[in-house]
Amino acid sequence: MIRNLYYEEQALMILNQNCLPEELVYERCERPEEVVAAIKGLKVRGAPLIGVTAAFGLAMAFSGYSGTGEARDVYFSRMKELFAATRPTAVNLFWALERMERVYRENHHLSPEELARRLCQEAQNLYKEDIRVNEAIGEQGQELLGEGSRVMTICNAGALATCGYGTALGVIRSAARRNKIEMVWACETRPVLQGSRLTVWELWQDKIPVTLLTDNMAGYTMSLGKVDAVITGADRIATNGDTANKIGTYSLAVLAKYHGIPFYVAAPLSTFDWNIKQGGEIPIEERSAEEVRTIKGSCLTVPVVDVFNPAFDITPEHLITAIICEKGIIRPPFGAAIKIWGREGE
């Protein structure tokens, strides 16, 4: 499976996902500011991968840093805030940064060289854990799919959005290994086209049957009886089950409910925000108008037209059939169940 990022010679090599599917381009980041720019610019995307990338970037900030004492504490806080400001909706980012801060606090008395080594090791741990977690999500979720399943998805919740294997696409991969998948319907996912550029490319590489749809074809496809389940990823899940995911997810959930199709969310426990009670509290990132006005530099509309471009929407819990995580399947009523799962995941 393709590597999204890897650490070598005190530099982070990242796969620039903006270049896919036309080119496979790795970029070398030698400074934390370059990693920040890569996250903001969507060269790296997907909630789990954003978190791990930020962890590596934070570790990189201490490679060669010789400060000690209070100056080092101030430097750590500044670097952490730099990464925390990149993508406000993806809670995995803050979870990973908290993991890194815990390691820093436990080891800040050590030499600069040893502290840097331990921070890098924690980032590596996060990377390996994410792959294991995604494989577990896949195994749990495939149980929900029968033979000949036709599954619809949006955005990219696959290996490209994680450190490997994927969440929603992890479920599809695990089901495909058991010959359960007849077709994956991939919504193109305007405005950045993660579905057409990334999900289709991933599934094509794995020889999993896939058909591309424009986003506004989803409802009609469901009405024809061609969809057995909808599976999406998540960027943040509130403790009542309300879920933030790529813009367009809410529309799919409404359509699935109307047509009597199960709607599943696949996400690790690190995507749950234990401090948020319901979806209205989740911050929704708004991105550049140019993402909507243009595609690959070509203008699609009046160049100065006003644009509303939220990157995510909120799917209320009553539209979700079940949430698939690494420990198992969470079913309604979500509030009580999520609290139990949260305690078990501590």
Curated annotation (Swiss-Prot):
Functional summary from the UniProt entry: Catalyzes the interconversion of methylthioribose-1-phosphate (MTR-1-P) into methylthioribulose-1-phosphate (MTRu-1-P).
Family to which the UniProt record says this protein belongs: Belongs to the eIF-2B alpha/beta/delta subunits family. MtnA subfamily.
EC number(s) on file: 5.3.1.23
Location of the active site: D235 (proton donor)
GO molecular function: S-methyl-5-thioribose-1-phosphate isomerase activity
Keyword Aminoacyl-tRNA synthetase carried by entry: no
Biological processes per GO annotation: L-methionine salvage from methylthioadenosine
InterPro entries: IF-2B-related (IPR000649), IF-M1Pi (IPR005251), IF_2B-like_C (IPR042529), Initiation_fac_2B_a/b/d (IPR011559), M1Pi_N (IPR027363), NagB/RpiA_transferase-like (IPR037171)
Residues bound to substrate: R45, G46, A47, R87, Q194, N245, K246
Gene: mtnA
Site residues, Transition state stabilizer: C155
Protein name: Methylthioribose-1-phosphate isomerase
Listed pathway(s): Amino-acid biosynthesis; L-methionine biosynthesis via salvage pathway; L-methionine from S-methyl-5-thio-alpha-D-ribose 1-phosphate: step 1/6
Keywords, ordered alphabetically: Amino-acid biosynthesis, Isomerase, Methionine biosynthesis
Reaction it catalyzes: 5-(methylsulfanyl)-alpha-D-ribose 1-phosphate = 5-(methylsulfanyl)-D-ribulose 1-phosphate
